[in-house]
Design a protein with these regions (language model features):
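Glycine- and acidic-residue-biased ligand/ion/polar-headgroup-sensing regions
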Residues: 56, 66-79, 83
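Short, surface-exposed secondary-structure edge patches
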Residues: 51, 70, 85-87
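Conserved short histidine dyad/triad with adjacent acidic residue
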Residues: 33-35, 45-65
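A short, N-terminal "cap"/entry segment at the start of jelly-roll beta-barrel domains
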Residues: 1-46, 81, 130
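Ligand-binding loop in jelly-roll beta-barrel domains
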Residues: 99-123
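Histidine-centered metal-chelating micro-motifs
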Residues: 58-60, 94-95, 99-104
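A cytosolic small-molecule/anion-sensing beta-strand core signal
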Residues: 74-75, 90-91, 109
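Short acidic-glycine-tyrosine-enriched beta hairpin
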Residues: 83-99
Length: 130
């Protein structure tokens, strides 16, 4: 469940009940059909946070992203492979990946993680002041 702070239209933060969100994801028809399940929790031009649930044996091959990426494992574990290295990320661990790196993930068991992407390309704001 998403909880907005103090119901103000211009709140500065949001809170999420991850346990409830995960339980709801695992009760969805797509999950029961063996599909991965993902939910965008926050999205802006600078950052995106996605809660993702994978079945055991799910493999994800990346594209070469221009963003830096962080995987925070909430449940389960992932095998992470890049051209130069391999590592297993366990529950409670986090992996940060720089931009422009191709990778492959394999869930070793039912796994839930937060995927955060951060835009590393500077945003330029132009001003037409006279």
């Amino acid at each position: 469940m998403l909880h907005k702070a103090k119901s103000s239209a211009d709140s500065l933060f949001f809170t999420f009940d991850l346990a409830t969100l995960i339980a709801n994801m695992k009760q969805s028809p797509s999950w029961e059909n063996g599909e991965l399940n993902a939910m965008i929790l926050s999205k802006s031009p600078e950052k995106q946070i996605v809660l993702t649930a994978l079945h055991r044996g799910t493999e994800i091959r990346s594209f070469q992203s221009n963003d830096s990426i962080t995987f925070q494992i909430i449940e389960g574990k992932l095998d992470f492979h890049s051209k130069k290295d391999s590592v297993t990320i366990d529950e409670g661990q986090m992996l940060t990946l720089h931009e422009n790196i191709k990778y492959k993930l394999t869930s070793m068991e039912e796994t839930v993680f937060l995927l955060t992407t951060a835009n590393t390309i500077p945003v330029t704001v132009e001003s037409n002041c006279m």
